[in-house]
């Protein structure tokens, strides 16, 4: 049994996403949902690069990027871009549970590399990414 998959926190996050995204796409009867954990690590002289790198679309309908923890990092700025390639918005997820909700068909999104603030301490950015795609 996978404790994370059965956790109250994850079930709450998925319920929130389901209610929100189903409200935006009332014709959808069933979703394909994926959950991914990402850690971007950085060390002095070697910035932590996001995955995937650069502005992109995930090929799904909706995306939640939920910050779990930032430790000793600078940057990690979330960017939202229009389909024409122009930057529409940028912001930094700072506190645990800060989030970006993305309509993947309408915008590109990405995040900048992270760098350690203090060279000899661990430096990382942990996010939970949840994607919803029409079944």
Language-model segment annotations:
Residues 25-95:
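Catalytic core of non-heme Fe(II) oxygenases with the double-stranded beta-helix
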Residues 76-135:
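Catalytic core of Fe(II)/2-oxoglutarate
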Residues 1-34:
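Signature of the catalytic double-stranded beta-helix
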Residues 17-26, 65-68, 97-98, 114-117:
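Intrinsically disordered, low-complexity boundary segments flanking structured domains
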